[in-house]
Amino acid sequence: MTAEDIVEKKEPKRLPVWACIPLFIGIFFIFMGLYGTLARGFLSMVLGVEARHPGLVGYILLESSMLLAVLTAAAIMLRFERCPFSGLGLSVRGHTKGLWYGFLMAVLLYVVGFGLSLAMGEVEVVGFQFKTWDLAGAWVFFLLVAVFEEILMRGYILGRLLHTRLNKFLSLFISASLFAFLHIFNPEINALPMINLLLAGMLLGAPYLYTRNLCFPISLHLFWNWIQGPVLGYQVSGNNFVSTMLKLNMPEKNVLNGGAFGFEGSLICTVLMILFTVLIIWWGEKRTAISLAVHRSC
């Protein structure tokens, strides 16, 4: 046997993560511009809707173009990196509990947070209306938002960072910082909302550290936004897209009720996100320790 026969074939070198992530973002922006232009053209020429005020159907179409852009960019990069598309963590099989956990956590956050706000007199319910189609349309819109942002920030960016030698919590912090920066041009943004957006990125990314799946983050993200805005009547990250089920009044806009930015701009939200993030990490570390103990005993 010659030396050539026993030399293993080396795999071709792959781009480092620090190069992959900017390249992915660049490709995403290219396709976002392309698909966004097509979507706005369709709204203008076919539906006769202005891009500045597209209405709920228009928002859904524009958000769909962004989701398509991030899926295209992810597919290109994963093929380039010789990684399976399943690596994004979109599989529902075996992760349906994550969908329920995300929903229940969002409900619990608002039961506590909204309940405290009412009890403290920081918000008042002054009106009620139930519009089925508005609530359903808003649910679809925020589903698209959740899937798009989770693929972008957790599925690809955090997923790639976790394949490096970086500490997993540092990787989580980096991806959460990028998530906060994604919202830097939102209306009514200031220091506390930016801190809370960073904490939201930590909260949404924490389950991914232990499952490498997006079911929990997508569900939590979806119901977080949907309950906050269309149901309870807050602004969602400074934005107001549709009519809401509850009409709220804030006697004074301050850091306890979030003011014009919405519940995400409140100190109550800050405390709750820290508590729930710690809870998820505690649960994940405990689960990992149990799995390692079982593996070693076998």
Question: For the regions a protein language model found, what residue spans apply to each?
Answer:
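Functionally important transmembrane alpha-helices
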Residues: 34, 193-254
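Hydrophobic alpha-helical transmembrane segments
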Residues: 18-26, 60, 64, 99-104, ...
